[in-house]
């Protein structure tokens, strides 16, 4: 996982692979982490899509970091705020 990547493959607890589209990545100085927001490509034609979020730490080369679950409500609140800002900006750009 690296910043700027467009698609990632997520492996669930059962070992099933799912190709996902990266919505965007961002860094938080407050939590000292990078985050990725993504959704399954199989849902992209649906009227509503479920957006997933994970944190990641790029390896020494700055690429292919491991995805980690979001750990705290404070992180979730920050991610929601960032997502809402992103979506508001997208709506403005469409007008």
UniProtKB/Swiss-Prot annotation:
It comes from the Bacteria. Pfam families: DUF1292 (PF06949). Belongs to the UPF0473 family. PANTHER family: UPF0473 PROTEIN CBO2561/CLC_2432, UPF0473 PROTEIN CBO2561_CLC_2432. This is UPF0473 protein BPUM_2377. It comes from Bacillus pumilus (strain SAFR-032). The lineage of its organism: Bacteria, Bacillati, Bacillota, Bacilli, Bacillales.
């Amino acid at each position: 996982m690296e910043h700027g990547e467009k698609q990632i493959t997520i492996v669930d607890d059962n070992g099933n692979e799912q190709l996902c589209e990266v919505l965007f990545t961002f860094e938080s100085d407050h939590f000292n982490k990078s985050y990725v927001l993504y959704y399954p490509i199989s849902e992209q034609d649906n009227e509503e899509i479920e957006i997933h979020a994970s944190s990641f730490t790029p390896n020494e080369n700055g690429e292919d970091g491991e995805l980690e679950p979001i750990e705290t409500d404070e992180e979730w609140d920050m991610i929601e705020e960032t997502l809402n800002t992103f979506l508001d900006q997208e709506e403005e750009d469409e007008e």
